[in-house]
């Protein structure tokens, strides 16, 4: 009897652990959404002041440049990640946000001169209340690869 009760106890413990592990892996659904907008072409007005890029006097995008636009919506306390990719034949130059954005990001790798970058996003807790979502538009300036 001792062996069977031990065996039953071990099997039931393993089953409970498996169920709890599956529930932990499932987690809650992410509230983060990312929506890619159309790529801005030459002649379009440059929407933000990109760091390290001298905008022309007329504030229009020059030839051989494109701007990738991504709309992000992130819940406070979340740390989602996304990959931004330049159009084929283009390489990333710099990234930008509008002044006063509710969502910020950090690049997980060195992206200058590469076609894509993985970004980890976070919400500014001073601008977004607990339980709310923050909104931002992320801009990626890309230049034609030579």
PLM features per residue range, with description:
Residues 1-32:
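Secretory targeting and sorting signals
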Residues 32-146:
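Extracellular attachment/recognition segments
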């Amino acid at each position: 009897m001792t062996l069977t009760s031990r065996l039953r106890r071990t099997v039931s413990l393993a089953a409970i652990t498996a169920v709890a592990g599956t529930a932990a892996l499932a987690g809650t659904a992410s509230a983060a959404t990312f929506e890619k907008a159309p790529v801005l072409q030459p002649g379009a007005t440059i929407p933000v002041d990109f760091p390290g890029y001298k905008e022309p006097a007329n504030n229009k995008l020059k030839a051989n440049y494109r701007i990738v636009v991504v709309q992000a919506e992130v819940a406070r306390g979340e740390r989602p990640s996304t990959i931004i990719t330049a159009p084929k034949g283009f390489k990333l130059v710099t990234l930008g946000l509008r002044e006063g954005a509710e969502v910020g990001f950090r690049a997980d790798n060195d992206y200058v001169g590469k076609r894509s970058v993985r970004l980890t996003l976070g919400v500014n807790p001073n601008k977004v209340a607990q339980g709310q979502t923050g909104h931002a538009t992320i801009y990626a300036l890309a230049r034609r690869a030579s």
